[in-house]
Amino acid sequence: MRHRKSGRQLNRNSSHRQAMFRNMASSLVRHEIIKTTVAKAKELRRVVEPLITLAKSDSVANRRLAFARTRDAEVVGKLFTELGPRYQERPGGYTRILKCGLRAGDKAPMAYIELVGRPEAAQAVEVEAAE
């Protein structure tokens, strides 16, 4: 029985899932909008929102925590220099999920996940996880 177990398995083992969400979080921070499946977008929200909350208070300890979770120095820099100050007054809810139909190959429900208040120049990037 799976009573009270949170999180989706997404047909992956735990290390694959962790690596996939680490990569997707880095892509979302870098591009500010990505296209993925609805289930992955909903799970990605649980990874990215705490990172942005962490970036709202800049300290060496918080930067090290963010680096431990993303393993990407460029992403950590953007989190603390751009995104943290941008969302300083917002108490959570930094992402938006917009459903965009079904994928052509397997009819999987697709969605854009984007950062709220992003510059309009940012273009969507498709993220395809290893399947």
Curated annotation (Swiss-Prot):
Gene3D superfamilies: Ribosomal protein L17. Part of the 50S ribosomal subunit. Contacts protein L32. The gene is rplQ. Belongs to the bacterial ribosomal protein bL17 family. The keyword Metal-binding does not apply. GO terms for cellular component: cytosolic large ribosomal subunit. This is Large ribosomal subunit protein bL17. It comes from the Bacteria. HAMAP family: Ribosomal_bL17 (MF_01368). GO terms for biological process: translation. The lineage of its organism: Bacteria, Pseudomonadati, Pseudomonadota, Gammaproteobacteria, Alteromonadales. One of its GO terms (molecular function) is structural constituent of ribosome. It comes from Shewanella sp. (strain ANA-3). InterPro entries: Ribosomal_bL17, Ribosomal_bL17_CS, Ribosomal_bL17_sf. PROSITE patterns: RIBOSOMAL_L17. Keywords: Ribonucleoprotein, Ribosomal protein. Pfam families: Ribosomal_L17.
